């Protein structure tokens, strides 16, 4: 029987993500983990290694696994090669009592199962309000995201949790904003006044605002 371990520290100070107490700029590729012939299942361990090597060769230092809990072999090789991973949960189709129950149980199982992989540096339970479509104003959905945040932190207080990646944040350790604008000039103009976006004075993406109603930006 063989095993391994890795040591690293992820922290946030003064608006910056630190790796081992040093500012670290994350160049992450959004990776949906599809394979040509086997779909969501990696065809082989060699294919996983080749995928990670290509990611590194293109200049990325990490991946945001999108809507997929990845094979443990992928996480192992990211541990070995020093590639960072944002671990994101697949979204429920809609918000209801059954979805809340199943999502909570499955998400906590995932956090506990993958807790010891040093490559994972951020937990992302929700993405772009998928499965919580009315979280911007619906108090029940907001409370659900708060509960998931605190349950995650109770298991793992050491990693950042981005509760709703992209927009309409409730409680979150990092304010992440998704923007699909293709014009650099428009992009520059839009983000010239950061305070207008973080205060919900203007939306950054169509009708999507940075914060959900009733929540304020705290510098995260």
Predicted segment positions?
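Substrate-binding/catalytic cleft of secreted carbohydrate-active enzymes
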Residues: 50-54, 62-220
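Secreted/periplasmic carbohydrate-active enzymes, especially glycoside hydrolases
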Residues: 1-72, 81-85, 121-122, 154
């Amino acid at each position: 029987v063989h095993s391994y371990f890795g040591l690293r520290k992820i922290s946030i100070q003064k608006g910056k993500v630190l790796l081992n107490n040093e500012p670290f700029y994350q160049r992450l590729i959004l990776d949906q983990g599809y394979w040509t012939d086997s779909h969501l299942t990696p065809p082989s361990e060699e294919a996983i290694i080749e995928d990670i090597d290509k990611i590194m060769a293109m200049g990325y230092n990490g991946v945001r696994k999108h809507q997929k809990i990845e094979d443990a072999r992928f996480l192992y090789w990211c541990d070995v090669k020093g590639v960072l991973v944002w671990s994101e949960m697949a979204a429920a189709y809609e918000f209801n009592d059954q979805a809340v129950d199943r999502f909570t149980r499955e998400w906590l199982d995932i956090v506990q199962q993958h807790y010891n992989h040093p490559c994972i540096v951020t937990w992302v339970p929700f993405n772009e309000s998928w499965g919580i479509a009315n979280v911007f104003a619906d108090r029940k959905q907001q409370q659900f995201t708060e509960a998931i945040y605190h349950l995650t932190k109770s298991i793992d207080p050491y990693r950042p949790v981005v509760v709703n990646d992209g927009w309409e944040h409730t409680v979150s350790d990092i304010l992440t904003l998704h923007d699909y604008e293709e014009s650099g000039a428009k992009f520059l103009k839009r983000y010239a006044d950061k305070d207008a976006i973080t205060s919900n004075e203007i939306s950054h993406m169509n009708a999507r605002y940075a914060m959900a109603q009733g929540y304020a930006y705290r510098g995260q």
